[in-house]
Every structure is written in C-alpha cells, then in structure tokens.
Amino acid sequence: YMPIHVKVVTAEEYSKWVESEKKILAAKADDPTKVWTQNDLIARGEKVYAANCAACHQANGKGAGPIKPVDGSAVVLDADKSKMIAVMLNGQNNGAMPAWKQLSDTEIAAVMTYAKNSWSNKTGQLVQPADIKTARK
C-alpha cells in the first residue's frame, strides 16, 4: 500500500510551482555538458539570431551602416572560436556590440554555430555549450 499525500495550494502558489518546474526542465534541456549535433545547433541558433541579433546585423547577416556584417566576418570565420566567444560574452566597440552574457551557454553556442554556417559562411565549424561554459570561468 502506498500512502498518497495531497497538498492544497492557492492558484497563485500552483502557478509559481509550475513556472519553477518549467525552469528546471529548461535548464536540463540546456545542459551545457550535452554534445549537440551541428544541425540541432544551427536550428536553435537561427531562432536565437532572429530574436537577438537580426535587428542590428540584419536577417541576411550583412549588417547596416556602422553595424558590422556577420556574413564574411573574419572573427566568425576564424577557426579559433575563442575570439568570437569573447565578443559574445564581453561585447566590443564600447558597447556598440553588446555583451550577451544573459543568454545560456547553449544559446550562445547555437547562435555562433548558426553564424559560422550561414549565408556565405560555410565553415563546417561548431561550438558546443561546454566551450562557452569554460570561457565564462
């Protein structure tokens, strides 16, 4: 026989509990030790780019005016991903390119992989969330 414990809570308490459970599930899904495939990173990165980067760098990666392009960028094309990671985490040009530390390790790895493999950037390179986690230390 298994005893059942029922806890009665208010609708507000229940909503808070549901939100906390969603955050726990999201954190597990974004486990920085998970090794992602290139296709999965690119698909996720496309969404991150559209939500956070396209406003300045344009959907086509070409940039506009003083905003530098991502398409064909030496930093993006460089096999040394530490340079692009530093830009993503710290920003550059006195804040013209903002830091994106608030994004998860998975989101940063995904958007970097997307940028490295979109438009004319066909590097075949990928960045794993563990790379971002290490760089944050």
Where are these regions (language model features)?
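Flexible coil segments in periplasmic/lumen-exposed cytochrome c-class electron-transfer proteins
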Residues: 11-42, 46-47, 51, 98-137
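Gly/Gly-Pro-rich "capping" loops immediately C-terminal to redox-active cysteine motifs
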Residues: 2-10, 58-103
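Terminal connector regions
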Residues: 1-2, 21
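Flexible, glycine-rich surface segments
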Residues: 31-60, 64-66, 70-74, 79
